[in-house]
Amino acid sequence: MKFKQIAFIFFLLIGYTLLAQDQIDYKADKIKFVKNYKGGAKRLIGHVQFTTKDGMYMTCDSSYFLDNNNIEAYSNIFIRQGDSLTITGKNAHYNGTTKLGLIDGNVVCTEKDMVLTTTVLNFDSKNKTASYQVGGTIVSKENTLTSKHGYYHSPTKTVSFKYDVKLVNPDYTMLADTLKYVTSTKTVIFLGPTNVLSKKDKLYCEQGWYNTQTQISHLTKKAAIYTGKNILYADSIHYDKKNESGNAYSNIRMIDTVQKTIISGNHSYSNKKTGIMWVTNNALLTKIMGKDSLFATADSMFAYEKKIKRLKMTLADSINHIEKDTTITKDEKDKKRLKIVKDTLNYIEKDSSTIKAYHHVKIFKTDVQGLADTMIFSAYDSTLTLYHLPVMWHKVNQLTGKLITVFFSNNKMDKIYIPENTFIISQIDTAHFNQIKGKLLWGYFKDDTLRKIDIVGNAQAVYYLQNDKKKLQGVNLIESSKLTVNEKKGTLNQITFHKKPIAKILPMKDLNVKEIEIKGFSWQDYKKPKSKADLFKKDTKIEITK
Protein backbone atom coordinates (compact mmCIF):
# COMPACT_ATOMS: atom_id res chain seq x y z
CA MET A 1 0.00 0.00 0.00
CA LYS A 2 1.39 3.41 -1.01
CA PHE A 3 0.76 5.30 2.23
CA LYS A 4 2.41 8.35 0.70
CA GLN A 5 -0.29 8.46 -1.99
CA ILE A 6 -3.02 8.16 0.66
CA ALA A 7 -1.51 11.12 2.51
CA PHE A 8 -1.45 13.07 -0.75
CA ILE A 9 -5.22 12.66 -1.19
CA PHE A 10 -5.88 14.08 2.28
CA PHE A 11 -3.34 16.83 1.72
CA LEU A 12 -5.11 18.00 -1.42
CA LEU A 13 -8.40 18.01 0.42
CA ILE A 14 -7.26 20.28 3.23
CA GLY A 15 -4.69 22.36 1.41
CA TYR A 16 -6.40 23.09 -1.85
CA THR A 17 -10.08 22.31 -1.38
CA LEU A 18 -12.16 24.77 -3.36
CA LEU A 19 -14.33 25.48 -0.36
CA ALA A 20 -11.39 26.93 1.52
CA GLN A 21 -10.27 29.46 -1.12
CA ASP A 22 -10.34 33.22 -0.49
CA GLN A 23 -11.52 34.07 -4.02
CA ILE A 24 -14.21 31.91 -5.63
CA ASP A 25 -15.96 32.46 -8.98
CA TYR A 26 -19.38 30.94 -9.49
CA LYS A 27 -22.20 30.65 -12.01
CA ALA A 28 -25.53 28.82 -12.34
CA ASP A 29 -28.67 28.67 -14.46
CA LYS A 30 -30.44 30.73 -11.85
CA ILE A 31 -29.02 33.02 -9.14
CA LYS A 32 -31.07 34.94 -6.60
CA PHE A 33 -30.58 36.57 -3.22
CA VAL A 34 -32.46 35.01 -0.28
CA LYS A 35 -32.61 37.65 2.45
CA ASN A 36 -34.17 35.55 5.22
CA TYR A 37 -31.73 32.61 4.94
CA LYS A 38 -29.04 32.86 7.65
CA GLY A 39 -28.81 36.64 7.35
CA GLY A 40 -28.81 36.61 3.58
CA ALA A 41 -27.35 34.29 0.97
CA LYS A 42 -27.01 33.85 -2.75
CA ARG A 43 -29.15 30.95 -3.96
CA LEU A 44 -27.65 29.13 -6.97
CA ILE A 45 -29.84 26.66 -8.86
CA GLY A 46 -29.11 24.45 -11.89
CA HIS A 47 -25.69 23.57 -13.33
CA VAL A 48 -23.93 25.32 -10.46
CA GLN A 49 -20.18 25.81 -10.94
CA PHE A 50 -17.47 27.11 -8.61
CA THR A 51 -13.91 27.76 -9.78
CA THR A 52 -10.71 29.17 -8.29
CA LYS A 53 -7.57 30.68 -9.76
CA ASP A 54 -5.46 27.63 -8.90
CA GLY A 55 -7.64 25.33 -11.00
CA MET A 56 -10.07 23.85 -8.46
CA TYR A 57 -13.50 23.18 -9.95
CA MET A 58 -16.79 22.10 -8.32
CA THR A 59 -20.26 21.46 -9.72
CA CYS A 60 -23.57 20.65 -8.00
CA ASP A 61 -27.32 20.94 -8.58
CA SER A 62 -27.92 23.77 -6.10
CA SER A 63 -26.10 25.82 -3.48
CA TYR A 64 -26.28 28.59 -0.89
CA PHE A 65 -23.30 30.96 -1.06
CA LEU A 66 -23.00 33.06 2.10
CA ASP A 67 -20.60 35.71 3.39
CA ASN A 68 -17.08 34.66 4.49
CA ASN A 69 -17.17 32.01 1.77
CA ASN A 70 -19.67 29.88 3.65
CA ILE A 71 -20.96 27.34 1.13
CA GLU A 72 -23.74 24.78 1.24
CA ALA A 73 -23.87 22.62 -1.88
CA TYR A 74 -26.47 19.95 -2.62
CA SER A 75 -26.86 16.99 -4.97
CA ASN A 76 -24.35 15.52 -7.41
CA ILE A 77 -21.25 17.11 -5.92
CA PHE A 78 -18.24 16.90 -8.24
CA ILE A 79 -14.83 18.41 -7.41
CA ARG A 80 -11.73 18.31 -9.59
CA GLN A 81 -8.20 19.46 -8.74
CA GLY A 82 -5.73 19.43 -11.62
CA ASP A 83 -5.60 16.30 -13.75
CA SER A 84 -5.43 13.70 -10.99
CA LEU A 85 -7.85 14.36 -8.11
CA THR A 86 -11.65 14.12 -8.29
CA ILE A 87 -14.23 13.99 -5.49
CA THR A 88 -17.90 13.10 -5.76
CA GLY A 89 -20.62 13.12 -3.12
CA LYS A 90 -24.17 14.10 -2.34
CA ASN A 91 -23.68 17.29 -0.29
CA ALA A 92 -20.84 19.63 0.74
CA HIS A 93 -20.66 22.21 3.55
CA TYR A 94 -17.95 24.71 4.44
CA ASN A 95 -17.80 27.38 7.16
CA GLY A 96 -15.43 30.15 6.16
CA THR A 97 -15.20 31.42 9.74
CA THR A 98 -14.35 28.14 11.51
CA LYS A 99 -12.59 26.74 8.43
CA LEU A 100 -14.48 23.46 9.00
CA GLY A 101 -16.16 21.53 6.22
CA LEU A 102 -17.50 18.18 5.15
CA ILE A 103 -18.62 16.22 2.13
CA ASP A 104 -21.22 13.50 2.69
CA GLY A 105 -23.32 10.93 0.88
CA ASN A 106 -21.34 8.19 -0.89
CA VAL A 107 -18.14 10.21 -1.04
CA VAL A 108 -15.62 8.98 -3.62
CA CYS A 109 -12.13 10.52 -3.88
CA THR A 110 -10.02 9.40 -6.84
CA GLU A 111 -6.32 10.22 -7.27
CA LYS A 112 -4.76 8.43 -10.25
CA ASP A 113 -5.15 4.69 -9.49
CA MET A 114 -6.23 5.15 -5.87
CA VAL A 115 -9.85 5.52 -4.72
CA LEU A 116 -11.10 6.56 -1.27
CA THR A 117 -14.77 5.93 -0.45
CA THR A 118 -16.62 6.90 2.73
CA THR A 119 -19.99 8.22 3.90
CA VAL A 120 -18.77 11.49 5.42
CA LEU A 121 -15.43 13.22 4.84
CA ASN A 122 -14.50 16.01 7.28
CA PHE A 123 -11.75 18.60 6.87
CA ASP A 124 -10.29 21.49 8.84
CA SER A 125 -8.44 23.92 6.59
CA LYS A 126 -7.20 25.98 9.56
CA ASN A 127 -5.50 23.13 11.41
CA LYS A 128 -4.90 21.29 8.14
CA THR A 129 -6.57 18.01 9.03
CA ALA A 130 -8.96 15.70 7.19
CA SER A 131 -10.79 12.63 8.47
CA TYR A 132 -13.58 10.13 8.16
CA GLN A 133 -15.20 8.57 11.24
CA VAL A 134 -17.98 6.39 9.86
CA GLY A 135 -15.89 3.89 7.93
CA GLY A 136 -13.81 4.21 4.81
CA THR A 137 -12.18 2.13 2.10
CA ILE A 138 -9.07 2.94 0.07
CA VAL A 139 -8.45 0.86 -3.04
CA SER A 140 -5.33 0.98 -5.22
CA LYS A 141 -4.02 -1.25 -7.98
CA GLU A 142 -2.95 -4.07 -5.64
CA ASN A 143 -4.23 -3.02 -2.22
CA THR A 144 -7.46 -2.49 -0.32
CA LEU A 145 -7.49 -0.74 3.05
CA THR A 146 -10.57 -0.44 5.25
CA SER A 147 -11.04 1.16 8.68
CA LYS A 148 -13.70 2.83 10.79
CA HIS A 149 -11.66 6.01 11.26
CA GLY A 150 -9.14 7.70 8.97
CA TYR A 151 -7.24 10.88 9.85
CA TYR A 152 -4.56 13.07 8.26
CA HIS A 153 -2.58 15.76 10.10
CA SER A 154 -0.65 17.92 7.66
CA PRO A 155 1.74 19.68 10.12
CA THR A 156 3.22 16.34 11.21
CA LYS A 157 2.69 14.71 7.80
CA THR A 158 0.93 11.81 9.56
CA VAL A 159 -1.97 9.70 8.28
CA SER A 160 -3.73 7.44 10.81
CA PHE A 161 -6.27 4.62 10.62
CA LYS A 162 -8.11 3.33 13.66
CA TYR A 163 -10.52 0.53 14.57
CA ASP A 164 -10.89 -2.63 12.48
CA VAL A 165 -8.05 -1.65 10.16
CA LYS A 166 -7.58 -4.17 7.36
CA LEU A 167 -5.07 -3.97 4.53
CA VAL A 168 -5.30 -6.66 1.83
CA ASN A 169 -2.36 -7.12 -0.53
CA PRO A 170 -1.55 -10.02 -2.92
CA ASP A 171 1.42 -10.88 -0.69
CA TYR A 172 -0.09 -10.31 2.75
CA THR A 173 -3.10 -9.22 4.81
CA MET A 174 -2.68 -6.77 7.69
CA LEU A 175 -5.19 -6.54 10.55
CA ALA A 176 -4.69 -3.78 13.11
CA ASP A 177 -6.34 -1.67 15.75
CA THR A 178 -4.41 1.48 14.84
CA LEU A 179 -1.92 2.33 12.08
CA LYS A 180 -0.02 5.56 11.59
CA TYR A 181 2.09 6.60 8.63
CA VAL A 182 4.65 9.39 8.93
CA THR A 183 5.34 10.65 5.40
CA SER A 184 8.55 12.49 6.36
CA THR A 185 10.23 9.27 7.54
CA LYS A 186 8.18 6.87 5.39
CA THR A 187 7.42 4.85 8.52
CA VAL A 188 4.28 2.87 9.43
CA ILE A 189 3.66 2.81 13.19
CA PHE A 190 1.67 -0.02 14.81
CA LEU A 191 -0.42 0.94 17.85
CA GLY A 192 -2.50 -1.83 19.40
CA PRO A 193 -2.93 -5.48 18.36
CA THR A 194 -1.57 -5.97 14.82
CA ASN A 195 -1.45 -9.12 12.65
CA VAL A 196 0.36 -9.42 9.32
CA LEU A 197 -0.58 -12.64 7.53
CA SER A 198 1.17 -14.06 4.46
CA LYS A 199 1.46 -17.45 2.79
CA LYS A 200 4.79 -18.13 4.50
CA ASP A 201 4.38 -16.57 7.92
CA LYS A 202 2.34 -14.57 10.40
CA LEU A 203 3.51 -11.58 12.40
CA TYR A 204 1.94 -10.20 15.58
CA CYS A 205 2.70 -7.27 17.87
CA GLU A 206 0.90 -4.64 19.90
CA GLN A 207 3.42 -1.90 19.24
CA GLY A 208 6.11 -1.28 16.65
CA TRP A 209 7.05 0.29 13.34
CA TYR A 210 7.99 -0.52 9.76
CA ASN A 211 10.01 1.70 7.43
CA THR A 212 8.62 1.31 3.90
CA GLN A 213 11.84 2.63 2.34
CA THR A 214 14.47 0.59 4.23
CA GLN A 215 12.07 -2.36 4.83
CA ILE A 216 13.27 -2.54 8.43
CA SER A 217 10.71 -3.28 11.16
CA HIS A 218 10.80 -3.15 14.94
CA LEU A 219 8.11 -5.05 16.86
CA THR A 220 7.48 -4.75 20.59
CA LYS A 221 4.87 -5.67 23.17
CA LYS A 222 3.94 -9.37 22.75
CA ALA A 223 5.92 -9.59 19.51
CA ALA A 224 5.61 -12.93 17.72
CA ILE A 225 6.47 -14.42 14.31
CA TYR A 226 4.86 -17.67 13.14
CA THR A 227 6.76 -19.38 10.29
CA GLY A 228 5.61 -22.83 9.25
CA LYS A 229 6.25 -25.13 12.17
CA ASN A 230 8.23 -22.49 14.11
CA ILE A 231 7.03 -19.74 16.46
CA LEU A 232 9.24 -16.92 17.77
CA TYR A 233 8.20 -14.87 20.81
CA ALA A 234 10.20 -11.96 22.26
CA ASP A 235 9.81 -8.65 24.05
CA SER A 236 11.13 -6.99 20.89
CA ILE A 237 12.06 -8.14 17.38
CA HIS A 238 14.13 -6.07 14.93
CA TYR A 239 13.89 -7.40 11.36
CA ASP A 240 15.55 -6.42 8.07
CA LYS A 241 13.34 -7.71 5.25
CA LYS A 242 15.88 -6.99 2.49
CA ASN A 243 18.57 -9.10 4.14
CA GLU A 244 16.06 -11.54 5.69
CA SER A 245 17.79 -11.23 9.04
CA GLY A 246 16.80 -10.01 12.47
CA ASN A 247 17.53 -9.76 16.17
CA ALA A 248 15.23 -10.54 19.09
CA TYR A 249 15.66 -9.28 22.64
CA SER A 250 14.46 -10.36 26.10
CA ASN A 251 12.23 -13.31 27.01
CA ILE A 252 12.87 -15.05 23.69
CA ARG A 253 11.16 -18.35 22.94
CA MET A 254 11.62 -20.18 19.63
CA ILE A 255 9.21 -23.12 19.43
CA ASP A 256 9.45 -26.01 16.97
CA THR A 257 5.95 -27.49 17.06
CA VAL A 258 6.98 -30.62 15.12
CA GLN A 259 10.12 -31.53 17.05
CA LYS A 260 8.53 -30.27 20.29
CA THR A 261 11.54 -28.16 21.23
CA ILE A 262 11.77 -24.68 22.71
CA ILE A 263 14.89 -22.50 22.67
CA SER A 264 14.75 -19.53 25.01
CA GLY A 265 17.15 -16.75 26.01
CA ASN A 266 17.54 -12.99 26.04
CA HIS A 267 19.25 -12.25 22.72
CA SER A 268 18.99 -14.01 19.39
CA TYR A 269 19.95 -13.48 15.76
CA SER A 270 18.42 -15.23 12.75
CA ASN A 271 19.04 -15.26 9.01
CA LYS A 272 16.53 -16.91 6.66
CA LYS A 273 18.99 -17.03 3.76
CA THR A 274 21.48 -19.15 5.71
CA GLY A 275 18.84 -20.90 7.84
CA ILE A 276 20.83 -20.11 11.00
CA MET A 277 19.67 -18.76 14.33
CA TRP A 278 21.67 -18.31 17.54
CA VAL A 279 20.59 -17.54 21.10
CA THR A 280 22.70 -16.25 23.99
CA ASN A 281 22.24 -14.85 27.49
CA ASN A 282 20.61 -17.61 29.57
CA ALA A 283 20.14 -19.86 26.55
CA LEU A 284 17.84 -22.79 27.41
CA LEU A 285 16.67 -25.73 25.31
CA THR A 286 13.46 -27.51 26.34
CA LYS A 287 12.69 -30.86 24.72
CA ILE A 288 9.09 -31.86 25.51
CA MET A 289 8.88 -35.60 26.12
CA GLY A 290 5.37 -36.67 27.06
CA LYS A 291 4.62 -35.68 30.65
CA ASP A 292 8.28 -34.91 31.29
CA SER A 293 10.71 -32.50 29.62
CA LEU A 294 14.45 -32.40 29.07
CA PHE A 295 16.13 -29.05 29.76
CA ALA A 296 19.60 -27.96 28.60
CA THR A 297 21.54 -24.73 29.11
CA ALA A 298 24.72 -23.38 27.50
CA ASP A 299 26.55 -20.13 26.89
CA SER A 300 25.09 -20.04 23.37
CA MET A 301 22.88 -22.14 21.12
CA PHE A 302 22.67 -22.33 17.33
CA ALA A 303 19.70 -23.67 15.35
CA TYR A 304 20.08 -24.69 11.70
CA GLU A 305 17.25 -25.36 9.25
CA LYS A 306 18.07 -27.25 6.06
CA LYS A 307 16.63 -29.76 3.61
CA ILE A 308 18.16 -33.24 3.69
CA LYS A 309 17.78 -35.67 0.79
CA ARG A 310 16.74 -39.18 1.68
CA LEU A 311 17.29 -41.98 -0.81
CA LYS A 312 14.31 -44.00 -1.95
CA MET A 313 14.76 -47.00 -4.27
CA THR A 314 12.08 -49.11 -5.90
CA LEU A 315 14.06 -52.00 -7.32
CA ALA A 316 12.27 -55.20 -6.35
CA ASP A 317 9.99 -55.64 -9.35
CA SER A 318 12.67 -54.82 -11.94
CA ILE A 319 15.33 -57.04 -10.35
CA ASN A 320 12.90 -59.93 -10.02
CA HIS A 321 12.14 -59.58 -13.71
CA ILE A 322 15.86 -59.90 -14.54
CA GLU A 323 16.31 -62.96 -12.30
CA LYS A 324 13.43 -64.73 -14.03
CA ASP A 325 14.91 -64.10 -17.50
CA THR A 326 17.13 -67.18 -17.90
CA THR A 327 18.31 -66.15 -21.38
CA ILE A 328 20.48 -63.35 -19.94
CA THR A 329 24.07 -64.13 -18.98
CA LYS A 330 25.45 -63.33 -15.51
CA ASP A 331 27.51 -60.37 -16.78
CA GLU A 332 24.50 -58.95 -18.61
CA LYS A 333 22.41 -59.32 -15.45
CA ASP A 334 24.99 -57.44 -13.39
CA LYS A 335 25.10 -54.61 -15.94
CA LYS A 336 21.31 -54.37 -15.97
CA ARG A 337 21.22 -54.29 -12.16
CA LEU A 338 23.63 -51.35 -12.13
CA LYS A 339 21.56 -49.50 -14.72
CA ILE A 340 18.35 -50.10 -12.73
CA VAL A 341 19.96 -48.79 -9.54
CA LYS A 342 21.12 -45.66 -11.35
CA ASP A 343 17.77 -45.07 -13.03
CA THR A 344 15.60 -45.71 -9.98
CA LEU A 345 17.38 -43.63 -7.37
CA ASN A 346 14.76 -41.24 -6.02
CA TYR A 347 15.57 -38.55 -3.48
CA ILE A 348 12.96 -37.24 -1.07
CA GLU A 349 13.69 -33.84 0.47
CA LYS A 350 12.89 -33.54 4.16
CA ASP A 351 13.13 -30.47 6.39
CA SER A 352 15.55 -31.03 9.23
CA SER A 353 16.72 -28.91 12.15
CA THR A 354 19.89 -29.15 14.19
CA ILE A 355 20.53 -27.42 17.51
CA LYS A 356 24.10 -26.93 18.68
CA ALA A 357 24.94 -25.76 22.21
CA TYR A 358 28.42 -24.52 23.07
CA HIS A 359 30.29 -24.24 26.36
CA HIS A 360 29.14 -25.09 29.89
CA VAL A 361 26.35 -27.37 28.71
CA LYS A 362 24.08 -28.67 31.48
CA ILE A 363 21.14 -31.05 31.14
CA PHE A 364 18.31 -31.81 33.52
CA LYS A 365 15.45 -34.27 33.25
CA THR A 366 13.69 -36.02 36.10
CA ASP A 367 15.72 -39.20 35.58
CA VAL A 368 18.62 -37.96 33.42
CA GLN A 369 21.19 -35.23 34.03
CA GLY A 370 24.34 -34.29 32.15
CA LEU A 371 27.35 -32.02 31.68
CA ALA A 372 29.53 -31.33 28.63
CA ASP A 373 31.25 -28.58 26.71
CA THR A 374 29.23 -29.12 23.51
CA MET A 375 25.85 -30.63 22.70
CA ILE A 376 24.19 -31.35 19.33
CA PHE A 377 20.51 -32.23 18.93
CA SER A 378 19.63 -33.52 15.45
CA ALA A 379 16.00 -33.77 14.38
CA TYR A 380 17.05 -35.77 11.29
CA ASP A 381 17.94 -38.89 13.28
CA SER A 382 16.44 -37.83 16.65
CA THR A 383 19.74 -37.85 18.54
CA LEU A 384 21.27 -35.81 21.33
CA THR A 385 25.08 -36.00 21.52
CA LEU A 386 27.39 -34.67 24.23
CA TYR A 387 31.00 -33.86 23.28
CA HIS A 388 34.19 -32.92 25.12
CA LEU A 389 34.32 -34.45 28.61
CA PRO A 390 30.67 -35.49 28.81
CA VAL A 391 29.09 -36.80 32.01
CA MET A 392 25.59 -38.26 32.19
CA TRP A 393 23.64 -39.47 35.20
CA HIS A 394 20.71 -41.84 34.87
CA LYS A 395 19.06 -42.55 38.21
CA VAL A 396 21.89 -44.07 40.35
CA ASN A 397 24.33 -44.48 37.45
CA GLN A 398 27.02 -42.08 36.24
CA LEU A 399 28.21 -42.55 32.64
CA THR A 400 31.27 -40.97 31.03
CA GLY A 401 33.12 -41.44 27.75
CA LYS A 402 34.69 -39.73 24.77
CA LEU A 403 31.20 -38.74 23.65
CA ILE A 404 27.67 -39.79 24.60
CA THR A 405 24.78 -40.08 22.13
CA VAL A 406 21.15 -40.63 23.16
CA PHE A 407 18.68 -41.82 20.51
CA PHE A 408 15.01 -40.87 20.82
CA SER A 409 11.93 -42.61 19.46
CA ASN A 410 8.44 -41.12 19.78
CA ASN A 411 9.88 -38.45 22.11
CA LYS A 412 11.22 -41.10 24.50
CA MET A 413 14.80 -42.23 25.11
CA ASP A 414 15.43 -45.36 23.05
CA LYS A 415 19.19 -46.08 23.01
CA ILE A 416 22.48 -44.67 24.32
CA TYR A 417 25.86 -45.01 22.62
CA ILE A 418 29.42 -44.36 23.88
CA PRO A 419 32.10 -45.24 21.27
CA GLU A 420 35.19 -44.99 23.47
CA ASN A 421 36.43 -44.69 27.09
CA THR A 422 33.18 -45.96 28.59
CA PHE A 423 32.99 -45.72 32.39
CA ILE A 424 29.90 -46.44 34.52
CA ILE A 425 29.77 -45.81 38.27
CA SER A 426 26.90 -46.45 40.68
CA GLN A 427 27.11 -45.55 44.35
CA ILE A 428 26.30 -48.08 47.09
CA ASP A 429 27.30 -45.84 50.01
CA THR A 430 29.72 -42.99 50.60
CA ALA A 431 32.75 -45.30 50.34
CA HIS A 432 31.76 -48.07 47.95
CA PHE A 433 30.97 -47.87 44.23
CA ASN A 434 30.16 -50.43 41.56
CA GLN A 435 32.31 -49.70 38.51
CA ILE A 436 32.32 -50.84 34.89
CA LYS A 437 34.86 -49.73 32.29
CA GLY A 438 35.28 -50.66 28.65
CA LYS A 439 35.70 -49.38 25.14
CA LEU A 440 32.27 -49.22 23.48
CA LEU A 441 28.80 -49.08 25.04
CA TRP A 442 25.30 -49.63 23.70
CA GLY A 443 22.43 -49.12 26.15
CA TYR A 444 18.72 -49.77 25.64
CA PHE A 445 15.80 -47.94 27.25
CA LYS A 446 12.24 -48.97 27.86
CA ASP A 447 9.75 -46.43 29.21
CA ASP A 448 12.69 -44.00 29.71
CA THR A 449 14.47 -46.49 31.99
CA LEU A 450 17.84 -48.02 31.07
CA ARG A 451 17.08 -51.76 30.95
CA LYS A 452 20.20 -53.25 29.35
CA ILE A 453 23.82 -52.31 28.61
CA ASP A 454 26.35 -54.04 26.36
CA ILE A 455 30.03 -53.13 26.79
CA VAL A 456 32.46 -54.40 24.17
CA GLY A 457 36.27 -54.26 24.36
CA ASN A 458 38.54 -54.54 27.41
CA ALA A 459 35.64 -54.69 29.85
CA GLN A 460 36.48 -54.38 33.55
CA ALA A 461 34.11 -54.49 36.52
CA VAL A 462 34.20 -53.92 40.25
CA TYR A 463 30.96 -55.33 41.60
CA TYR A 464 30.09 -55.52 45.32
CA LEU A 465 28.24 -58.55 46.62
CA GLN A 466 25.36 -57.95 49.06
CA ASN A 467 23.11 -60.19 51.12
CA ASP A 468 19.34 -59.90 51.40
CA LYS A 469 19.75 -57.16 53.99
CA LYS A 470 21.95 -55.13 51.63
CA LYS A 471 25.03 -55.77 53.77
CA LEU A 472 28.28 -55.91 51.80
CA GLN A 473 29.79 -59.42 51.70
CA GLY A 474 32.66 -58.96 49.28
CA VAL A 475 33.69 -57.58 45.91
CA ASN A 476 33.91 -59.28 42.54
CA LEU A 477 36.74 -58.12 40.25
CA ILE A 478 36.23 -59.23 36.65
CA GLU A 479 37.86 -58.68 33.26
CA SER A 480 36.29 -59.74 29.96
CA SER A 481 36.19 -58.80 26.29
CA LYS A 482 32.44 -58.20 26.56
CA LEU A 483 29.84 -57.90 29.29
CA THR A 484 26.09 -57.31 29.52
CA VAL A 485 24.34 -55.56 32.39
CA ASN A 486 20.58 -55.93 32.94
CA GLU A 487 18.24 -53.89 35.09
CA LYS A 488 16.62 -55.44 38.15
CA LYS A 489 14.31 -53.56 40.50
CA GLY A 490 15.35 -50.19 39.13
CA THR A 491 19.13 -50.70 39.22
CA LEU A 492 21.68 -52.20 36.81
CA ASN A 493 22.99 -55.12 38.86
CA GLN A 494 22.71 -58.30 36.81
CA ILE A 495 26.05 -58.70 35.02
CA THR A 496 26.78 -61.35 32.41
CA PHE A 497 30.35 -61.84 31.14
CA HIS A 498 31.24 -63.36 27.79
CA LYS A 499 34.27 -65.12 26.31
CA LYS A 500 36.25 -66.54 29.25
CA PRO A 501 36.21 -63.80 31.89
CA ILE A 502 38.97 -63.53 34.50
CA ALA A 503 37.40 -63.09 37.93
CA LYS A 504 38.23 -63.12 41.61
CA ILE A 505 36.25 -62.37 44.75
CA LEU A 506 37.77 -60.46 47.66
CA PRO A 507 36.26 -60.41 51.18
CA MET A 508 35.30 -57.11 52.78
CA LYS A 509 37.70 -57.66 55.65
CA ASP A 510 40.81 -55.52 55.29
CA LEU A 511 39.62 -54.35 51.82
CA ASN A 512 41.25 -51.16 50.55
CA VAL A 513 38.63 -49.62 48.24
CA LYS A 514 41.14 -47.23 46.68
CA GLU A 515 43.38 -50.07 45.57
CA ILE A 516 40.57 -51.80 43.64
CA GLU A 517 39.27 -48.67 41.95
CA ILE A 518 39.44 -48.94 38.17
CA LYS A 519 41.86 -46.47 36.59
CA GLY A 520 40.06 -43.25 35.64
CA PHE A 521 37.49 -43.51 38.46
CA SER A 522 35.93 -40.09 39.09
CA TRP A 523 32.66 -39.76 41.00
CA GLN A 524 31.22 -36.34 40.10
CA ASP A 525 27.81 -36.46 41.70
CA TYR A 526 28.40 -33.12 43.42
CA LYS A 527 28.26 -31.47 39.98
CA LYS A 528 24.98 -33.10 38.97
CA PRO A 529 22.11 -30.64 38.42
CA LYS A 530 19.47 -31.54 41.00
CA SER A 531 16.76 -29.29 39.52
CA LYS A 532 16.03 -27.04 36.56
CA ALA A 533 17.17 -24.06 38.67
CA ASP A 534 20.63 -25.66 39.04
CA LEU A 535 21.16 -25.30 35.30
CA PHE A 536 21.77 -21.57 35.73
CA LYS A 537 24.20 -21.87 38.64
CA LYS A 538 27.89 -21.13 38.12
CA ASP A 539 29.81 -24.00 36.54
CA THR A 540 32.40 -26.24 38.13
CA LYS A 541 35.22 -27.51 35.93
CA ILE A 542 34.49 -30.89 34.34
CA GLU A 543 37.04 -33.58 35.14
CA ILE A 544 38.73 -35.78 32.56
CA THR A 545 38.15 -39.55 32.75
CA LYS A 546 40.93 -41.63 31.21
Regions found by a protein language model. Give the residues of each.
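Bacterial Sec-dependent N-terminal signal peptides
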Residues: M1-D25, T545-K546
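N-terminal amphipathic/hydrophobic interface segments
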Residues: A20-K546
